[in-house]
Amino acid sequence: MKASLEILKGLDRSLTVDLPIDIFNQKTDKILQKIASQVNFDGFRKGKVPVAVVRKRFGNNVNSDAINEIVNETLTDALTQVKATPVSQPVISKIDSEDEKNFSYTVDFEVFPEIKVADFSKLTIEQIKVEITKADEQRTLNGLKEQLTEYKAVKRKSEIGDRLSIDFKGLIDGKTFDGAEAKDFKIVLGKGSMIKGFEEGLIDVTPNSMLMLDLVFPKNYHMNKLSGKAVTFEININEVALPKEPKLNEVFAKKFGEKDMDALKVSIKMQMKVEIDGRIGYLNKNAIFDALSEANQFDVPQSSIDNEAQNLLKEMKERIQQQGGLPAQGEIPASAFNDEAQRRVKLGLLVNQISNDNKLSASLEQIDAKLQEISQAHGKDTQKIIDSYNQDPTKKLSIELLVIEKMVQDLILDKAKVTFKQKKFQEIT
């Protein structure tokens, strides 16, 4: 067997394997003889059908089967011979079985990039720090109060703190636009949930009244097509309702599963810490890996990007179904996820290379600690979580990879130039 590797553009490779034609002929003869011993043909006893007759009837299928068997039997050795490791299953691109002396096939594939990781000491990374203040805790408690706040309709003019029920329609140049209309829309005055001027225009209005507001969308509005546009809102006031806040007592605390207010405040603080730790961890990890990715430029296998994009599309569809959502109108192409897929694949290759270079491995103790961290964050039974992962090799591997990923982060932070930026709880939640 002779194997020759052609280096194409980027990570693309083409491998041609040459074999004696006798190997192909012997393989086809063997398959033909097997078929001849099994098939029934008119005019012939079973098992007595001439091979020539079988070849005429099944020749193309036999050749295809023979080629597949030869490729399966020889490809691994051929790849070893040329020292190539495909990223995914090689694809047959050419077959030559007509030559009198040789049979050859060509497969195309991508290889993994050769990665020489950049010096960590050259990286500059910003990490976020957040301190939870008493004011943050009070805001969270106020949010719980709002959940249990009741509203009673009144016949007076509206004030800050009142909840209004309105119908509205927005017009730009006399025409409506997406999201411009709503019926029985609830808005609490003073929350700042609408564009500037909207809530202000609803102060001192009475039930069953109508008004028009001429406003301008902010230049940094999240919908670009509306940014900076002048808009007229036609508004009907259906109801003005006075808030009745709940008392902060034992009854209030029990509605949130705690015995009293002291226990509720402790629970709030713990939940805020879990939330902020998760958010900071996510942002700081991204900052580390963004710096790592920027410092290491190399080709990323397109086949891996395509596979990851398909995975991301599948995850999105599953999330929509789990949340009770309806399928999107029209199929979303996997290519819509290419940028994120490329990022994930590249970082996966970098983490793997760093792990290999530094001989990193996750101990059982580290894996169990990570499982406990996950179970505590989700408020679930720790032992059940650990048992479920230990019984599923795929799940256990995912935890092992998370542990190694964290080890890589720590390794980078230990050597990089790291700066810290203090932020407020509200800024990152």
Curated annotation (Swiss-Prot):
EC numbers on record: 5.2.1.8
Keyword vocabulary terms for this entry: Cell cycle, Cell division, Chaperone, Cytoplasm, Isomerase, Rotamase
UniProt xrefs under InterPro entries: PPIase_dom_sf, PPIase_FKBP_dom, Trig_fac, Trigger_fac_C, Trigger_fac_C_sf, Trigger_fac_ribosome-bd_bac, Trigger_fac_ribosome-bd_sf, Trigger_fact/SurA_dom_sf
Swiss-Prot/TrEMBL GO biological process terms: 'de novo' cotranslational protein folding; cell division; chaperone-mediated protein folding; protein transport; protein unfolding
Top-rank lineage group of the source organism: Bacteria
Broad class of where this protein is predominantly found: cytoplasm
Record-level Gene Ontology MF annotations: peptidyl-prolyl cis-trans isomerase activity; protein folding chaperone; ribosome binding
Major enzyme class: isomerase
The PPIase FKBP-type domain, residue ranges: 161-246
Transmembrane spans: none
Function (record text): Involved in protein export. Acts as a chaperone by maintaining the newly synthesized protein in an open conformation. Functions as a peptidyl-prolyl cis-trans isomerase.
Record note on domains: Consists of 3 domains; the N-terminus binds the ribosome, the middle domain has PPIase activity, while the C-terminus has intrinsic chaperone activity on its own.
The protein's name: Trigger factor
Gene that produces this protein: tig
